[in-house]
A protein has these predicted regions:
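Second-shell loop/turn segments in exported
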Residues: 32-38, 80, 151-159, 192-196
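Soluble non-cytosolic domains of exported or imported proteins
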Residues: 43-47, 84, 92, 135, ...
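Sec/Tat-exported extracytoplasmic proteins
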Residues: 49, 53-61, 85, 94, ...
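A conserved helix-loop-strand patch within extracytoplasmic ligand-binding domains
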Residues: 102-175
Length: 209
């Protein structure tokens, strides 16, 4: 499958329905329960969105819907679902995390074409969170490679959002150095030399900060 990378500064949220939700599709039951398996930083988003969806669904069908949330590193969540974690919906950070679930035979081929925008309902801009008052005057990627700056970011090996962080840094360096790969790699190396903690997910990185 051709990879459809969005922007290097965007977080792909791929969405796929898993299994059969008879109650949802036929509206026969008074209530229905669904589980959304998602990546780390979306917890608060869905806590708010679920209330809107529950109201909408009640008005549309007369059904009450109970939504259970599961959160963690995107790759880890995909592996959990592939290995048996029951999910009705997955909202993950990377296309190939959903592909891993497809490869396990839990969703049909072609999921990426099922909804508009390659099944990417939203994007998330990368921002820098700094100490109060921004004492080191951090404004752009160049500031993160200064020797007196410590960086906290999730591990790209376990976190989908961290991979977008990595790609955003790469895109910045590619533009800055006109595609000179040696200089790009040097920039990325200097950035990760400043990383104090590589947590497994975005929530852990926020806690460490």
């Amino acid at each position: 499958m051709k990879r459809r990378w969005k922007s290097a500064v965007a977080a792909l949220a791929a969405i796929a329905a898993i299994g059969s939700l008879t109650g949802v599709t036929t509206y026969a039951a008074d209530s229905v329960s669904i589980t959304n398996v998602s990546y780390d930083p979306t917890r608060e988003l869905y806590e708010q969105y679920n209330k809107i969806f529950q109201k909408h669904w009640k008005e549309k069908t007369g059904q009450d819907v109970d939504i259970t949330q599961s959160h963690g590193g995107s790759g880890k969540q995909a592996l959990e679902v592939a290995n048996g974690l029951e999910a009705d919906v997955v909202t993950l950070a990377l296309e190939y995390d959903v592909d891993a679930i497809q490869d396990a035979g839990l969703i049909d081929d072609g999921w990426v074409d099922e909804f508009p925008e390659d099944s990417s309902p939203y994007t998330s801009t990368i921002v820098f969170l700094v100490r109060k008052g921004n004492p080191k005057n951090i404004k752009d990627w160049d500031d993160l490679v200064k020797k007196d700056v410590g960086v906290i970011t999730p591990n790209p090996k376990t976190s989908g959002g961290a991979r977008w962080n990595y790609l955003a840094a790469w895109a910045y360096a590619k533009d800055k150095y006109n595609g000179d790969e040696d200089k790009i790699k040097e920039f990325i190396g200097n950035l990760y030399k400043n990383v104090l903690v590589l947590d497994t997910g975005a929530r852990g990185a926020t806690t460490s900060f």
